[in-house]
Amino acid sequence: EVPANAVTESDPTAVALKYHRNAEASERVAAARPGLPPEEQHCENCQFMLPDQGADEWRGCSLFPGKLINLDGWCASWTLRAG
């Protein structure tokens, strides 16, 4: 079930960052960021994901304050989590 405060793909910030809740539907190959091959880039291993916010596959993201992103998602700001 999608939480009420989940980022929608029509959200202005989501549009600007090319966010998709399903990384496979995103432009991550064309816009791949350094750190991992494009097919391994998703919100779950991004430094902006906030693991202490949300639950299950929906977590916080410092780029979307007060909203939740899907761990299987991707956006153009993806950056490999340190460690």
From Swiss-Prot:
<feature type="binding site">
    <location>
        <position position="43"/>
    </location>
    <ligand>
        <name>[4Fe-4S] cluster</name>
    </ligand>
</feature>
<keyword id="KW-0249">Electron transport</keyword>
<comment type="function">
    <text>Specific class of high-redox-potential 4Fe-4S ferredoxins. Functions in anaerobic electron transport in most purple and in some other photosynthetic bacteria and in at least one genus (Paracoccus) of halophilic, denitrifying bacteria.</text>
</comment>
<dbReference type="InterPro" id="IPR036369">
    <property type="entry name" value="HIPIP_sf"/>
</dbReference>
<dbReference type="InterPro" id="IPR000170">
    <property type="entry name" value="High_potential_FeS_prot"/>
</dbReference>
<keyword id="KW-0479">Metal-binding</keyword>
<dbReference type="GO" id="GO:0019646">
    <property type="term" value="P:aerobic electron transport chain"/>
</dbReference>
<keyword id="KW-0813">Transport</keyword>
<feature type="binding site">
    <location>
        <position position="75"/>
    </location>
    <ligand>
        <name>[4Fe-4S] cluster</name>
    </ligand>
</feature>
<feature type="binding site">
    <location>
        <position position="61"/>
    </location>
    <ligand>
        <name>[4Fe-4S] cluster</name>
    </ligand>
</feature>
<dbReference type="GO" id="GO:0009055">
    <property type="term" value="F:electron transfer activity"/>
</dbReference>
<dbReference type="GO" id="GO:0051539">
    <property type="term" value="F:4 iron, 4 sulfur cluster binding"/>
</dbReference>
<feature type="binding site">
    <location>
        <position position="46"/>
    </location>
    <ligand>
        <name>[4Fe-4S] cluster</name>
    </ligand>
</feature>
<keyword id="KW-0574">Periplasm</keyword>
<keyword id="KW-0004">4Fe-4S</keyword>
<dbReference type="Pfam" id="PF01355">
    <property type="entry name" value="HIPIP"/>
</dbReference>
<dbReference type="GO" id="GO:0042597">
    <property type="term" value="C:periplasmic space"/>
</dbReference>
<keyword id="KW-0408">Iron</keyword>
<comment type="subunit">
    <text>Homodimer.</text>
</comment>
<dbReference type="GO" id="GO:0046872">
    <property type="term" value="F:metal ion binding"/>
</dbReference>
<protein>
    <recommendedName>
        <fullName>High-potential iron-sulfur protein</fullName>
    </recommendedName>
</protein>
<keyword id="KW-0411">Iron-sulfur</keyword>
<comment type="similarity">
    <text>Belongs to the high-potential iron-sulfur protein (HiPIP) family.</text>
</comment>
